From Swiss-Prot:
This is GDSL esterase/lipase ENOD8. Its EC number is 3.1.1.-. The keyword Metal-binding does not apply. GO terms for molecular function: alpha-L-fucosidase activity; hydrolase activity, acting on ester bonds. Has lipase and esterase activities. Probably involved in root nodule physiology. The gene is ENOD8. It is found in: Symbiosome. Glycans are attached at N105, N191, N198, N276, N330.
Length: 384
């Protein structure tokens, strides 16, 4: 009987060995759980601004924010932006702007983004110019100061210590970047040729990477970095450069090619950075493709008039007067208001997207299909 038991046991040894081998060979990314980011830190321009520029200067006028918040919150949309949907996907609150000193809660992160921000240091800034003084380098400096101050507040204790991130959140958080659009726009409206704007891209990307490195050196490890969208589909470009050659869908072809070149160089630089920063999980997020698909097949998503801004007044693209601004026509004050149903439009104000469009783009980048490496949002803490 003992002999037979030994025979039976020996028959099972190969199977046990096989199971152990399979478990050992399986890549860790498939064996581990989804990322549970306790906080988000955001850097960039208007696409991810939740009120930074508004805190420093003034909020965009009504009807900005009308769809979801029913008031202007400093977001450049009729409602929520992609960053809001990302936060909610992790059951985190909407991010408070770093610059907002009243009513802010930084327990689960902070937003350093500011509408009108650039990667390169701008020459013409608000209030006299059009660009934000809070370039990416300034946002990095603000983040560095934020870390320093949270340590001080944490040591002091008290009620304010309950409104800041825990110390280990900085290394466990998701770091989101969405910037670069304004660097390209400066060239377009600065009378540069397409070739001249393209020539500035390598320098812009190099500065981008340097700032990402700086933030990595402060403890950031999980990076979710958006490329830029199709600039040539924006009504503000179509209206100001009417002679631009259009593609078959109506977008300004050469301006989109600049966006694609920027994305190519950024993706290339991030691949190199990924190989150099062994502790970092760096995901390049292709925003261009899902945004462009809205213009190539608007009916699929329930949109109409893809190149006409929902909020504005006058002209072919409804941006003769900016959203929320007013104009006197024959003694009558006309306020540039919202279209009847923003959920049927892609573009909100000539530049920025509606909440409806933002939600669709979010749902597509969420899966990782458009990302490099192809990692979904809930796996963005892992290297692949």
């Amino acid at each position: 009987m003992k002999f037979m038991a030994k025979i039976e046991l020996s028959r099972h040894i190969p199977l046990v060995t096989l199971i152990v081998l399979v478990l050992c060979i399986t890549p860790p990314i498939f064996a581990t759980k989804n990322c549970d980011f306790p906080a988000i830190f955001s850097f960039g321009a208007s696409n991810v601004d939740t009120g930074g520029l508004a805190a420093a200067f003034r909020a965009p006028p009504s009807p900005y924010g009308e769809t979801y918040f029913h008031r202007s919150t400093g977001r450049f949309s009729d409602g929520r932006i992609i960053l809001d949907f990302i936060a909610r996907s992790f059951r985190l609150p909407y991010l408070s702007p770093y610059l907002n000193s009243l009513g802010s809660n930084f327990t689960h992160g902070a937003n350093f983004a500011s509408g009108g921000s650039t990667i390169n240091i701008p020459k013409s800034i608000l209030p006299n110019g059009k660009l934000s003084p809070f370039s990416l380098q300034i946002q990095y400096i603000q983040f560095k100061e934020f870390i320093s101050k949270t340590k001080l507040i944490r040591d002091q204790g008290g009620v304010f210590a309950t409104l800041i991130p825990k110390e280990d959140y900085f290394s466990k958080a998701l770091y989101i970047f969405d910037i670069g659009q304004n660097d390209l726009t400066i060239g377009f409206f600065g009378n540069k040729t397409i070739q001249q704007v393209n020539a500035t891209v390598p320098d812009i990307v190099n500065n981008y990477i340097e700032n990402i490195k700086n933030i990595y050196n402060l403890g950031a490890r999980s990076f979710w970095i958006h490329g830029t969208g199709p600039k040539g589909c924006a009504p503000v470009i179509l209206a100001n450069f009417p002679s631009a050659i259009k593609d078959s869908y109506g977008c300004a072809k050469q301006y989109n090619e600049v966006s694609q070149y920027f994305n190519f160089k950024l993706k290339e630089a991030l691949a190199e950075l990924r190989s150099n920063l062994s502790s970092a999980a760096i995901t390049y997020v292709d925003i261009y493709t899902p945004k462009y698909s809205l213009f190539t097949n608007p009916e699929k998503y329930g949109f109409e008039l893809p190149f006409v801004a929902c909020c504005g007044y006058g002209g072919e693209y409804n941006i003769g007067v900016g959203c929320g601004a007013s104009i006197n026509i024959n003694g009558t004050k006309i306020v540039a208001g919202s279209c009847k149903n923003p959920s049927t439009r892609i573009i909100w104000d000539g530049v920025h997207y509606t909440e409806a469009a933002n939600e669709i783009v979010f749902s597509q980048i969420l899966t990782g299909v458009f990302n490099d490496p192809p990692i979904s949002l809930d796996r963005a803490c892992y290297r692949k």
